Amino acid sequence: ERYHRDLFYSANIYFDLRRLYANYNNCLNEKLDLELLHNIRPPLSIAEEIKINKTAKVHIIGVCIETRPDALDDEWLWRFRRWGVTRVQLGAQHVDNKILKKINRGHTIEQLLWAMKYLKDNCFKIDIHIMPDLPGATPEIDKAMFDYVYSVVCPDQMKVYPCEVVPWTIIEKWYKKGTYIPYFEKNNEDLIDVVRYSMTTCPNWVRL
């Protein structure tokens, strides 16, 4: 909570801070004197800082936070409201339960749909992360995934980032054993076609 409060606090005193330094660029290269900073005024409660920010010169128009579809509950939602969060990012990765289980994602498509409704019912904007070319996926499966996302999941924004083999992961072990070969490596045009499909079929109201 202190982190979020200080986001609004720093925006609210931004121009007061600039006046403390004859050359603002020096401020960026010096160790900030917290005592001097608090002489401007000490930070208030997060609710007070958010209220002040509504009319501040440096106005924070949105705060985005990332979580999992299976990690939401009333307590977390209350915290999001208190922290001034306006947009929530959900790591969905895929909409096929078989693929989600294979990669040990730990949640299901049903939990994603519940989280989407839960957040929208409480007036949050929602981003989701989608990952084509996961183990078990094919170009056809991934195209169907985007159809499902646009027609059923209905996010406000979506980030698409193809699966990447990274060190110290089970996917790397599968890759080295040859049990997982990204379809991009078999034919890179397949992945390009899938990403192109995600763009050309994307509704106007989804930010991609």
Regions found by a protein language model. Give the residues of each.
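Conserved non-cysteine loop/helix-boundary elements of the Radical SAM core domain that shape
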Residues: 1-193
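Long hydrophobic segments that form regular secondary structure
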Residues: 192, 198-203
